[in-house]
Each structure stands twice: as structure tokens, then as C-alpha cells.
């Protein structure tokens, strides 16, 4: 009881105060003006809407996806909306060499990098797991491993700019979902890896923020086609979702929750979890870890 009064209650008070004040921090579109941003999976859906919002805010944008023709249309529209500059590089994230080279090319086009928004996924269908290991491997490579490759390639530039990494994930990466086992596994992997890297940045004073975006069902054409007649759930608008993703990255938030289940942030993003994480980090002797 004495330990709780002396340590835990004051710490909990500090965390509650942090959440209260950080929740009231205001986003301003000019935060993105002139910023150099990469958006993956930007030929349609959420990624395309992210690119359009960034363009309206006056950012430099480099987009990527597999479809060259669609990317050309996205870039043309970004320029009409007011982007400081807009470029595309077409390719597949199944190719890790492309992923690594893409970041270098994008950095040269913009003269640096301030924000890396990782949004791409491979196609996923609702079905019971049928022991298809090839499908699991593809989901993990595209939805997870390519994110790691892109991040490793981008970190030198992001460290120079004190930039941000924004990882678009899913509620399926916080709560296991049936019918999408490989997809869910890849999203859990994103949470585990990037949350760990965020803590490593805190321990080593690396000023590169990592924002994990936990999304519910969003009304993209692909998602609506897949869930039609299978899942009775209201979808949230992709345009607003894209804006919330940008806001979270600009405000350097640890996590962003977006969807029509309003209770999700209260249950999954609670200050008690943060307190436990904080106390856990205090156990690490960073000087010995760095020397090793």
C-alpha cells in the first residue's frame, strides 16, 4: 500500500495529465506545408486520400503502388490540389530490392524525407485458413517485412529531419479476427515490431516518432466488395480516415484509433498500459546495452 501511494498513484496522475493535455493538442494543416512525404499503397483507397490531403496542405509527395497508370492520375491530381511537388515510382512490395531502392529514389526526388507513411497491403480474402503456407508467407512479406525494409532504408533521412514513421495497421492487429488469419498475423507483427522500435528510440534518444494507426472497417472499394453479405458492420469514411492518419503522424502520437467502434480507444489505448510499459523500460540499463 505504501508503495502504491508513494510511486504508483503519482505516476498514474502524471500519465492521466499527459493524456489529457496531449488529447487537446491541435493539428494545423500548415504542419505539413513543405514537408517531404512518402505514401505507399497510394493508387487507391486510403493511400490515395492521404496523398490528396497532403497535396492540399502543400507537402512534397512521392507515391508508390503497382499501377503506373493510376499513379500518374494520382500525381496529376495532387499537383492540381496544390502539392509543392508530386512524383510516383511504380513497383511491387513483393520485391524487397525495389522497396529499398524506392526509398533512396524518393529521397533524391524530394531532397530528403520528413514522413514515411506505410499503407500498402497484399490482397486478402475472407476465408477459413486452408493450410496455404505460400499465402501466409506472401502476407508476411508484403504486409510486414517490406515495412521493415522501407523503414531501415528511410531511417537515416528521418534521423536527419527528426521525422516520423506512420504505420497503417488494423484492429485485426490488436484483436484476432477469424477468416483473415494470415492478414491478422501480419498486423500483429507490425504492432510488435514498431512498438518495440519506438521504445528503442526512447531509450537511445532517437527523435523519430512512430505512429501506429489502428483502423476498423473503412469504406474503400476493396473492403466493401470483400465484406458485402459476409459482415454486418458499418464502415467509416476513407477520406476522414486518411486525415486522421496524417494528424496522428504530424502530432507524433504513438497510436491512432479510427473506425465506428467508439469504445475501442478506451479499451485498447488506456493509460494503465502506458504506465506498465514505462515501469518496464526503467529496468533496462541502456549504457550496457549500447556497449554490447
From Swiss-Prot:
<feature type="binding site">
    <location>
        <position position="170"/>
    </location>
    <ligand>
        <name>substrate</name>
    </ligand>
</feature>
<feature type="glycosylation site" description="N-linked (GlcNAc...) asparagine">
    <location>
        <position position="207"/>
    </location>
</feature>
<keyword id="KW-0325">Glycoprotein</keyword>
<dbReference type="GO" id="GO:0005496">
    <property type="term" value="F:steroid binding"/>
</dbReference>
<keyword id="KW-0492">Microsome</keyword>
<dbReference type="GO" id="GO:0005789">
    <property type="term" value="C:endoplasmic reticulum membrane"/>
</dbReference>
<dbReference type="GO" id="GO:0006706">
    <property type="term" value="P:steroid catabolic process"/>
</dbReference>
<dbReference type="GO" id="GO:0047022">
    <property type="term" value="F:7-beta-hydroxysteroid dehydrogenase (NADP+) activity"/>
</dbReference>
<dbReference type="InterPro" id="IPR036291">
    <property type="entry name" value="NAD(P)-bd_dom_sf"/>
</dbReference>
<keyword id="KW-0560">Oxidoreductase</keyword>
<keyword id="KW-0472">Membrane</keyword>
<comment type="function">
    <text>Controls the reversible conversion of biologically active glucocorticoids such as cortisone to cortisol, and 11-dehydrocorticosterone to corticosterone in the presence of NADP(H). Participates in the corticosteroid receptor-mediated anti-inflammatory response, as well as metabolic and homeostatic processes. Plays a role in the secretion of aqueous humor in the eye, maintaining a normotensive, intraocular environment. Bidirectional in vitro, predominantly functions as a reductase in vivo, thereby increasing the concentration of active glucocorticoids.</text>
</comment>
<keyword id="KW-1133">Transmembrane helix</keyword>
<dbReference type="InterPro" id="IPR020904">
    <property type="entry name" value="Sc_DH/Rdtase_CS"/>
</dbReference>
<dbReference type="Pfam" id="PF00106">
    <property type="entry name" value="adh_short"/>
</dbReference>
<comment type="pathway">
    <text>Steroid metabolism.</text>
</comment>
<comment type="subunit">
    <text>Homodimer.</text>
</comment>
<feature type="topological domain" description="Cytoplasmic">
    <location>
        <begin position="2"/>
        <end position="7"/>
    </location>
</feature>
<feature type="binding site">
    <location>
        <begin position="41"/>
        <end position="67"/>
    </location>
    <ligand>
        <name>NADP(+)</name>
    </ligand>
</feature>
<dbReference type="GO" id="GO:0102196">
    <property type="term" value="F:cortisol dehydrogenase (NAD+) activity"/>
</dbReference>
<dbReference type="GO" id="GO:0070524">
    <property type="term" value="F:11-beta-hydroxysteroid dehydrogenase (NADP+) activity"/>
</dbReference>
<keyword id="KW-0812">Transmembrane</keyword>
<dbReference type="InterPro" id="IPR002347">
    <property type="entry name" value="SDR_fam"/>
</dbReference>
<feature type="binding site">
    <location>
        <begin position="183"/>
        <end position="187"/>
    </location>
    <ligand>
        <name>NADP(+)</name>
    </ligand>
</feature>
<feature type="binding site">
    <location>
        <begin position="92"/>
        <end position="93"/>
    </location>
    <ligand>
        <name>NADP(+)</name>
    </ligand>
</feature>
<keyword id="KW-0735">Signal-anchor</keyword>
<feature type="binding site">
    <location>
        <begin position="119"/>
        <end position="121"/>
    </location>
    <ligand>
        <name>NADP(+)</name>
    </ligand>
</feature>
<keyword id="KW-0443">Lipid metabolism</keyword>
<dbReference type="InterPro" id="IPR051253">
    <property type="entry name" value="11-beta-HSD"/>
</dbReference>
<feature type="glycosylation site" description="N-linked (GlcNAc...) asparagine">
    <location>
        <position position="123"/>
    </location>
</feature>
<keyword id="KW-0256">Endoplasmic reticulum</keyword>
<keyword id="KW-0753">Steroid metabolism</keyword>
<feature type="transmembrane region" description="Helical; Signal-anchor for type II membrane protein">
    <location>
        <begin position="8"/>
        <end position="24"/>
    </location>
</feature>
<keyword id="KW-0521">NADP</keyword>
<feature type="topological domain" description="Lumenal">
    <location>
        <begin position="25"/>
        <end position="292"/>
    </location>
</feature>
<feature type="binding site">
    <location>
        <begin position="218"/>
        <end position="222"/>
    </location>
    <ligand>
        <name>NADP(+)</name>
    </ligand>
</feature>
<feature type="active site" description="Proton acceptor">
    <location>
        <position position="183"/>
    </location>
</feature>
<feature type="glycosylation site" description="N-linked (GlcNAc...) asparagine">
    <location>
        <position position="162"/>
    </location>
</feature>
<protein>
    <recommendedName>
        <fullName>11-beta-hydroxysteroid dehydrogenase 1</fullName>
        <ecNumber>1.1.1.146</ecNumber>
        <ecNumber>1.1.1.201</ecNumber>
    </recommendedName>
</protein>
<comment type="similarity">
    <text>Belongs to the short-chain dehydrogenases/reductases (SDR) family.</text>
</comment>
Amino acid at each position: 500500500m505504501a508503495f502504491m501511494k508513494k510511486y504508483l498513484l503519482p505516476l498514474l496522475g502524471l500519465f492521466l495529465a499527459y493524456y489529457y493535455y496531449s488529447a487537446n493538442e491541435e493539428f494545423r494543416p500548415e504542419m505539413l506545408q513543405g514537408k517531404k512525404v512518402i505514401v505507399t499503397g497510394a493508387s487507391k483507397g486510403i493511400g490515395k486520400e492521404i496523398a490528396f490531403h497532403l497535396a492540399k496542405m502543400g507537402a512534397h509527395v512521392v507515391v508508390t503502388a503497382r499501377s503506373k497508370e493510376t499513379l500518374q492520375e494520382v500525381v496529376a491530381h495532387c499537383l492540381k490540389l496544390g502539392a509543392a511537388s508530386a512524383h510516383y515510382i511504380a513497383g511491387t512490395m513483393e520485391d524487397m530490392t525495389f522497396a529499398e531502392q524506392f526509398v533512396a529514389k524518393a529521397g533524391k526526388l524530394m531532397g530528403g524525407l520528413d514522413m514515411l507513411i506505410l499503407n500498402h497491403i497484399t490482397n486478402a480474402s475472407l476465408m477459413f485458413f486452408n493450410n496455404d503456407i505460400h499465402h501466409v508467407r506472401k502476407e508476411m512479406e508484403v504486409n510486414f517485412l517490406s515495412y521493415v525494409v522501407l523503414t531501415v532504408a528511410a531511417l537515416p533521412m528521418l534521423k536527419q529531419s527528426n521525422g516520423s514513421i506512420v504505420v497503417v495497421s488494423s484492429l485485426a492487429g490488436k484483436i484476432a479476427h477469424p477468416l483473415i488469419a494470415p492478414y491478422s498475423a501480419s498486423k500483429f507483427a507490425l504492432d510488435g515490431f514498431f512498438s518495440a522500435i519506438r521504445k528503442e528510440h526512447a531509450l537511445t534518444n532517437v527523435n523519430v516518432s512512430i505512429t501506429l494507426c489502428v483502423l476498423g472497417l473503412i469504406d474503400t472499394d476493396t473492403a466493401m466488395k470483400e465484406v458485402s453479405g459476409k459482415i454486418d458492420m458499418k464502415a467509416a469514411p476513407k477520406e476522414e480516415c486518411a486525415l486522421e492518419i496524417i494528424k496522428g503522424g504530424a502530432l507524433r502520437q504513438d497510436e491512432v484509433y479510427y473506425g465506428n467502434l467508439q469504445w475501442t480507444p478506451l479499451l485498447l489505448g488506456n493509460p494503465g498500459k502506458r504506465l506498465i510499459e514505462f515501469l518496464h523500460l526503467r529496468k533496462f540499463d541502456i549504457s550496457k546495452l549500447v556497449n554490447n
